[in-house]
């Protein structure tokens, strides 16, 4: 970094901000590894509130809150990352769903997302490095002891096991940790033996 200054070792990171109409969007920063200094480099304004970001290789996957209730809002946006610049590569929606997290499988040919509000885990094929559409949906059917807040499933987090053989989803509404096996075409099958309730 710096044409006429001493070369610095920097890492790049991005932050999503709900904010107002003026400052809602994605901020890109440099982090000077040598001294910990953070330098704001760019801002990309967005109409919707970014909820979660997942950078995989040269692409970043963002989930947006559907604040309008319209079927075309919300969804997942895929950006190509070029240093601190982002270029929209693909965008998918699914009847206005708001997804709160995405993960990619080891081969990066399928993405998975969770919908807290509707209790769903969805499969998204990736072709020629771009997300295509929601191809499969697993509707979770959990519930637990709180008669108001736990009447239905609310998935809150997901990740792959370290060996990438199982997708783990935590369900706040069902007080459950659910393990899924990934099929050849991205389909998810619940592993009843490994999954467990917390209460």
Please report, for each region that a protein language model flagged, where it lies by residue.
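An edge-strand/N-cap motif at the start of beta-rich repeat modules
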Residues: 3-31
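Short loop/turn segments immediately following beta-strands, especially the blade-tip
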Residues: 29-36, 79-85, 123-133, 181-188
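Residue position within the beta-strands of beta-propeller blades
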Residues: 15, 62-63, 113, 169
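Short glycine/acidic-enriched loop and turn motifs that connect beta-strands
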Residues: 19-22, 66-70, 117-120, 174-176
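Asp-box/WD-like beta-propeller blade repeats and closely related beta-sheet repeat scaffolds
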Residues: 86-157
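Conserved loop/turn at the beginning of each blade in beta-propeller domains
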Residues: 46, 95, 151, 198-199
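Conserved beta-strand position repeated across blades of beta-propeller domains
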Residues: 52-54, 103, 159
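Short coil/turn segments that connect the beta-strands within blades of beta-propeller domains
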Residues: 10-11, 56-58, 107-109, 163-165
């Amino acid at each position: 970094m710096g044409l006429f200054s001493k070369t610095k070792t920097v890492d790049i990171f991005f932050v999503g901000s709900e904010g107002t109409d003026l400052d809602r969007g994605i901020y890109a920063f440099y982090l000077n590894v040598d001294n910990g200094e953070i330098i704001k480099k760019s801002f990309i304004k967005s109409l919707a509130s970014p909820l979660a970001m997942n950078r995989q290789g040269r692409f970043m996957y963002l989930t947006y809150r559907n604040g309008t209730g319209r079927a075309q809002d919300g969804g997942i946006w895929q950006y190509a990352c070029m240093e601190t610049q982002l270029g929209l590569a693909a965008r998918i929606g699914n009847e206005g769903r708001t997804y709160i997290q995405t993960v990619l499988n080891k081969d990066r040919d399928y993405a998975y997302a969770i919908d807290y509000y509707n209790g769903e885990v969805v499969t998204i094929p990736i072709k020629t490095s771009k997300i295509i559409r929601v191809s499969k949906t697993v509707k979770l059917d959990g519930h637990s002891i709180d008669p108001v807040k736990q009447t239905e499933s609310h998935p809150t987090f997901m990740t792959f096991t370290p060996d990438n053989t199982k997708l783990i989803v935590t369900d706040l509404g069902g007080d459950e940790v659910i393990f899924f096996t990934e099929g050849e075409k991205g389909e998810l099958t619940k592993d009843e033996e490994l999954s467990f309730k917390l209460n």
